[in-house]
Amino acid sequence: MCIRDSNYLVKLSVKERIYVAVNKKKFIEGIDRILSKNSYDRIVIWRSSFGWDVPLYQRPQHIFSNFAKQRTLVFYEVTRFTDDVKRIKKQADNLYLVNYANTAFSKLLFQELEKCKAPKYVQFYSTDWTLPAAKIKEYMQQGYKIVYEYIDDLNPHLAGTDELPVNVKEKYDLAMTDKNIFVVVTAEALKKDVIEKRGNVRLAFSSNGVDYAHFHDGCDPNFKCDEEFESILKKGQPVIGYYGALAKWFDYDLLKKIDQENKYQVVLFGIKY
């Protein structure tokens, strides 16, 4: 079975497995060319179903674009639902998009990574529900250091379920009990939770931010706002912009208080959950 559109289900393709096997030497040479470069000091494997080419350019793209600029070789997971990547694609220097669902190719990648002496890390989101804790333990046994990004309150609504997905809960429990795992938090409440469970060990605080250049440098100087937005600008008041999910955990009460002040204009950009 072989599907040829952008949702390339390569993991189901017998033809793809044969193609990788026949061209094994070529693929290994390509991977080795990447690993032989003197442009990095460490390697990060990003495992997540977030994807790269998604409507909201958010934390993962910001972080790993900058990691790549700071001598970190990144192999960033993309999904068959978001990115048309059969095997591997160079996104930027030191930044490669990888379809790990292509097990034939990813096996070759990890085979060559095993020979590499640079420090290696596996990094993933706390909210990721696709990667099981057993796989994380497998990475640890292979010598990878683990980075657990505790980015949000663990809420089943994020996954669209009534209960917290098993993979989310088990990875959280693993991160809270194994002090060899690095934990990155984005908020004080999450930091407090971690300290209560495992102390202030291998803990880093990294709040969400904005990649200013991403939003500014590509602006079209001739772009014209629609009439509704022009009317907001003409009011001459400070504009507060929000960019992110419009979900039940959003503080709508705070929004109402700001509106009552009648001093600001608020513009919301995001996907409604």
Segments (PLM) and residue ranges:
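Conserved small/polar residues in nucleotide/adenosyl-binding loops
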Residues: 1-6
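N-terminal subdomain of nucleotide-sugar transferases
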Residues: 7-83, 261
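A short, histidine- and acid-enriched strand-loop-helix "catalytic/donor-clamping" loop
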Residues: 52-53, 147-163
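Carbohydrate-associated surface elements
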Residues: 189, 206-209, 218
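Conserved donor-binding/catalytic core segment of Leloir-type glycosyltransferases
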Residues: 229-250, 255-256, 261, 266-267
